[in-house]
């Protein structure tokens, strides 16, 4: 996987270099989505997060440094990323709804938001309105995200190792997860919200992978269950290995 990624980016670089003299910068490349992210509850200024999305897109995606339920999803001074989160949050004071997260890990299997968090550096982070990339130092993993009108494409580059996994966190206050190994698919829903939604509110999601699952786990709270493919509880998630 890593070799293929290096070849792809090498060809891309060659193409850009060959056309450098005719390059026209798209206005969107002037946008810095990190502006306003150096804010916390005690000093509420900016109050933004790096939203990766299409204009008028159904869903936004963002790296998550704050804990689940923290309106300050991403804080510039934070040192660790806990996941990559689907979000609809308009303001930290209003908080979020329709939210879940994805996080790659390697080595020892960890899945809670405290254990799975990885150190990162802004020097190894690329942030555009249409693209996000970051190197997760604890796992030697690079995560890339770009979006469509209603979905997102992830490319995750793992190192060569015995255990590479992806953690899906459907968050608390009522959630559901199901792994479908025969289709390389995970489905589920999350109900976590901050009021102002119908009583039967659910945010459904479907995750499709381009590689088969070598291992399957579901989890609730801090309990991990191997080969149990479906789970409903207050706070559930899944872990699939490759």
Q: What are these language model-derived features?
A:
Residues 21-242:
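Accessory carbohydrate-recognition regions in carbohydrate-active enzymes
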């Amino acid at each position: 996987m890593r070799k293929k990624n290096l070849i792809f980016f090498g060809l891309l670089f060659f193409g850009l270099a060959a056309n450098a003299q005719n390059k026209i910068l798209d206005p969107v490349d002037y946008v810095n989505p990190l502006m306003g992210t150096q804010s916390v509850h005690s000093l509420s200024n900016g109050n933004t997060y790096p939203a990766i999305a299409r204009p008028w897109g159904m869903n936004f995606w963002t790296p998550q440094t704050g804990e689940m339920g923290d309106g300050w999803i991403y804080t510039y001074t934070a040192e660790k990323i806990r996941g990559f989160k689907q979000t609809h949050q308009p303001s930290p004071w209003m908080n979020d709804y329709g939210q879940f997260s994805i996080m790659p890990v390697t080595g020892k299997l960890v899945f809670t938001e405290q254990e799975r968090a990885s150190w990162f550096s802004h020097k190894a982070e690329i942030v555009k309105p249409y693209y996000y990339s970051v190197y997760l130092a604890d796992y030697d993993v690079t995560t890339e995200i770009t979006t469509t009108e209603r979905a997102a494409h992830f490319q995750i580059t793992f190192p060569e190792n015995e255990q590479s996994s992806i953690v899906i966190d459907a968050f608390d206050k009522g959630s559901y997860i199901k792994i479908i190994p025969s289709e390389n698919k995970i489905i589920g829903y999350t109900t976590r919200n901050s009021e102002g939604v119908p009583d039967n509110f659910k945010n459904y999601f479907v995750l499709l992978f381009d590689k088969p699952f070598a291992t399957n786990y579901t989890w609730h709270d801090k309990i991990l269950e191997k080969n149990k493919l479906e789970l409903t509880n207050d706070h559930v998630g899944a872990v699939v290995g490759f």
